[in-house]
Design a protein with these regions (language model features):
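N-terminal capping/lid subdomain adjacent to the active-site entrance of alpha/beta enzymes
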Residues: 1-109, 114-123, 127-131
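Catalytic core of soluble alpha/beta enzymes
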Residues: 82-214
Length: 214
């Protein structure tokens, strides 16, 4: 298990399709079937969602970026996300400033580097982003570069997020052991369908609980 996803995603896709079939056979919504088997029959009917956007594309100016983020807010989202690292640091900060003009009380911005930064760049962004009350700073470096992730806690005290591109319980455990993630503020983003399916995902959740994560 582990690696960069070709095997785990294929198996996870099949696994989730099988679970969907089982739910159809039993005549239940899949969320209720899983709650019956793993959640004492009590599904959580409220989940956290956010609107991801803020990509880079030709012709996009700050006005269009603000319009995009405003459209998410108008649809009821309280957390929105934009990409970083596709422009210079200074330009990314200007883009963030533009979005901040749109957000009101109770609304927050996440930023996502999609693993593109080396350590020096990740630190430079961490220092610059510290001036904002961001919801999180996501995946600054390669998801398997636990040393980089751990180093950032010395430069960024606000919430960070990673784990979306880790695909097994072993990878998740190594992130907890060596990545410097903080249970009181940081976010772990493991994805069931990408992580060999439900069985491996449940193993990952159990490991997190053992290490003090909710």
């Amino acid at each position: 298990p582990g690696g960069h996803g070709e095997r785990s995603v294929a198996i996870g896709t099949i696994d989730m399709a099988v679970w969907d079939t089982v739910a159809k056979i039993e005549g239940k919504p899949l969320f209720q079937l899983l709650a019956d088997r793993y959640g004492e029959g009590k599904p959580n009917r409220k989940i956290f969602v956010y609107a991801a956007g803020g990509d880079y594309y030709p012709g996009q100016d700050h006005g269009k970026l603000k319009d995009e983020m405003r459209s998410y807010i108008d649809r009821g989202y309280t957390v929105v996300k934009k990409k970083i690292g596709g422009a210079s640091l200074d330009e990314d900060l200007r883009r963030i400033d533009s979005i901040m003009e749109v957000l009101q009380d109770g609304q927050k911005l996440c930023v996502d580097a999609n693993g593109r930064f080396d350590l020096d760049t990740a630190i430079a962004y961490a220092k610059a982003l510290s001036q904002y009350d961001l919801f999180w700073y996501e995946e600054p470096g390669d998801p398997l570069d636990f040393e980089l992730q751990a180093a950032l806690r010395n430069y960024y005290t606000n919430p960070m997020a990673t784990g979306e591109d880790l695909f097994s319980m072993q990878d998740a455990r190594n992130l907890i052991r060596y990545g410097g993630m903080r249970p009181d503020r940081d976010w772990l983003q493991f994805d069931c369908a990408l992580s060999y399916g439900l069985v491996e995902y449940l193993r990952t959740l159990d490991m997190h609980k053992e290490h003090g994560w909710s």
